[in-house]
Amino acid sequence: MLSGLTARYTKTSSGYMGQLLEWPEVITEGVDIEDCRQSLEDAAREMVLAYRQQNKEIPVEHSLFETIMVEMA
């Protein structure tokens, strides 16, 4: 079964950092966004396996995210 998780990518001095918003423990880095995305997908798969082995509940998407506009100047 496929489940959607929300990835957040942040530009760093060495490339990109990726994190799953629903599963904050899953954090990766990559030299570019594609590398970071692949690492994040791999890390998520590994975490699913680890959580299943430990009989832990796997986080699922239950949130709504939206952008709000705020005047900054």
Functional labels for PLM-detected ranges:
Residues S13, V31, Q38-S39:
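An amphipathic alpha-helix/helix-turn recognition signal
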